[in-house]
Amino acid sequence: SISKGHNCNGININKGVKKTNALYVSDDPIFSMNRSQKAKILEILNAEARALDPRVVQVMAGLSCTHRTTLVMPTDNPSRYDIKPMVHLSVSVVMEKDGRREVGYASAGGAILLDELLKNNSLKDLAKEAVRIASVNMEAIPAPAGTMTVVLGAGWPGVLVHEAVGHGLEGDFNRTGSSAFTGKIGQKVASEACTIIDDGTIPN
């Protein structure tokens, strides 16, 4: 077995574990609060959302926590591990007026602990954003259709970059030569108007 011989088919994997600079805490968010404290967070979101606008008829809030450990064991370098806490809090509100119903949604979280959600009016701000979106949707009219120029801001439009560029940069696609970016390191692959920065160390 691997554990018995510290090798796999003759490949030595016993090279120790190298520590690098931590980008986030390694504590487990799952046990950072008890069940009643977690429920209280959802109760606060519910109360805040309903207090912001009398048209809010339903509030749905969710809280999830994970604590993931990843170990990378190359054959030619020291092993490295990543311990990442992940917290996700979301709230969705249903607003109704004159027979019309609209929904607003907002979420927060990241590689943080649960107590971060209670700082700086975070819960109230989250509820306020969900209610704001629902309110905007209540007054919304059908958007114009057809071909037009658009400007994408920061945030969710990043999903478009992920799909259009991110998957094409994956190692397997480039190894097999099936990516549009294969063999183009150092070459321009987009228009002059397009600049994409991928840096996992940028805060938030």
Predicted features and spans:
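Active-site bordering "gate/hinge" segments
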Residues: 1-203
